[in-house]
Design a protein with these regions (language model features):
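Nudix hydrolase/Nudix homology domain
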Residues: 33, 97-146
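Short coil/turn segments
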Residues: 26-29, 119
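Conserved N-terminal beta-strand and adjoining loop/helix that marks the start
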Residues: 2-22, 42, 73
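Active-site-adjacent beta-strand/loop module that shapes the phosphate/pyrophosphate-binding cleft
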Residues: 8, 74-97, 107, 111
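Short solvent-exposed loop/turn micro-motifs enriched in small/polar/acidic residues
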Residues: 5-8, 69, 99-100
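The catalytic Nudix box helix
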Residues: 38-70, 110
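Conserved beta-strand segments that form the floor/walls of ligand-binding pockets within enzyme
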Residues: 22, 37, 87
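Short, charged/polar surface micro-motifs in flexible loops or helix N-caps
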Residues: 16-21, 29, 44-45, 91-96
């Protein structure tokens, strides 16, 4: 009997500034170039999703964040690989300077901006979750309801 390959576990950050979320466009040298996503990366062996996200955001963007609460976990088949994306609402602890090793453009997106962006497929379920909030700033209230 063949063993099923485990999904690739990746994490993405919901970084809020008022009622806007920082979204990032994948750079030309990355897979799915030109598509928008929530910045993040792979969960390494022995890491919690929160630890992985805090490490990835620091490595790629030079930002210090604090993970607050998971917004969405969904599995998406991309080519022949299943991607499990866990999107986590985070607090941004340092100012964003506009740098990332994996992205070529950034946008502080309003809720109204989200549907018009061309998203990486694994991020779409979380985008749908976000569209269900009256105001994106409500995510912080949602995050503190532990």
């Amino acid at each position: 009997m063949e063993s099923m390959e485990q999904p690739l576990h990746v994490v993405g950050a919901i970084l809020l500034q008022g009622d806007r979320i920082l979204v990032a466009r994948r750079a030309p040298h990355k897979s799915a170039p030109g598509l928008w996503e929530f910045p993040g990366g792979k969960v390494e062996a022995g890491e919690s999703p929160s630890e992985a996200l805090e490490r990835e955001i620091l490595e790629e963007m030079g930002l210090t964040i604090k993970s607050l609460k998971t917004l969405d976990v969904s599995d998406t088949l991309v080519g022949e690989r299943e991607i499990r994306l866990e999107v986590i609402v985070c607090e941004l602890l340092t100012d964003f300077e506009g740098f990332s090793s994996d992205h070529d453009e950034f946008l502080w997106a309003s809720k109204d901006d989200l549907p018009s962006l061309k998203w990486a497929t694994p991020d779409l379920p979380a985008v749908q979750q976000l569209l269900g909030f009256d105001n994106l700033s409500d995510l912080l209230r949602y995050s503190s309801d532990r």
